[in-house]
Amino acid sequence: MNSLVATPPVPPHFYEHSRFSPSRSMSTPAQQSSNRKRKAEDDGNDVDIRMSASPTNSPAFTPRPLPNRQMKRSRPNVSGRPLSLPRLLETLDTDALRSVLQAVCQRHPELGDEVVHTAPRPSVSSTLQVLRNYQSTLQTSIPLGSGEYLSDYAYNRVKQHLFNLLDALSDFTPHFLPPNESQTSVSLTYLDGATDIIHSLPKWQTPRHNIGRDSAYEEICKAWVLVIREAAKRGGGIQLQYGGWDQKLAKHNETSGGKLQDAINELQNSLGWMGSSALPGVGAAGTQGGDQTSIREQLLSGTYGMGMPLKVGPW
């Protein structure tokens, strides 16, 4: 008879480990991931793993070169220094720059010749603007309520500005005369503007103070005569005929009180009968009551002879 051997009781906690767990392969996780296909979510997990990994396990980053910036290095020592020539010239106004240039040319005369040949020729508009600036300074210096003829007190106040204007006229006028100026239209345009400025010169109660004004009229009249002679040599004075200079010169002569009569006579001699009727007080025009329509204009417009009786019958 078989005897049963009593087995000792098994503790309950041993039963917790008696379950069968799924068999696991002994291969490494890297081998398992290589044996199956990669999925999109696996790539995201790998990125998370790499980002959470320690720097020692992360791949090495190759340094990229930074762009080279052209920056001025700050000077270690700050000290005062003079401005460079371009920066210095930027701070100078017109008057200061003119004074510096004149001083340099006076010290070095050879530079003056270089400036004269390098500088552009002054235009009529710029020159007349300079003269108008002198004229404006003169007009603003005249005391208020002086009347048409100014007193000696007013003359003493403005004589320096008057001399500046007269000197400028005397210096600028020869520049626009032949042979220095080859274009007659430029010369006539300047003389027209310069004569207007002379008209605005003040008149003085003391006759000797008017010498400067009378001298200016005399010089500008000689300039008109010279330019008219030069213009008459070119194309028979066609520019004088069709430019209306006969009318302008006649108006200047009237405003000056007949001080430009020599220029009027020269123009009448240059144009002959073609311009005589356009000049009041010269030739036949003086007997026609100042008729402003010249024979030249009548011929060009085709109205010459209209209104005149036509003779019929034997001559």
Swiss-Prot record:
**Where is composition skewed (Polar residues) in this entry?**
20-34
GO CC annotations, alphabetized: cytoplasm; nuclear membrane
Q: What is its main location?
A: cytoplasm
A Pfam family recorded for this sequence: Cut8
Record GO terms (molecular function): proteasome binding
The function of this protein is: Involved in ubiquitin-mediated protein degradation. Regulatory factor in the ubiquitin/proteasome pathway that controls the turnover of proteasome substrates. Targets proteasomes to the nucleus and facilitates the degradation of nuclear proteins.
The cross-references to PANTHER family, in alphabetical order and at most eight, read: FI02826P
Q: What is this protein called?
A: Tethering factor for nuclear proteasome sts1
Which organism is the protein's source?
Talaromyces stipitatus (strain ATCC 10500 / CBS 375.48 / QM 6759 / NRRL 1006) (Penicillium stipitatum)
Q: What is the lineage of its organism?
A: Eukaryota, Fungi, Dikarya, Ascomycota, Pezizomycotina
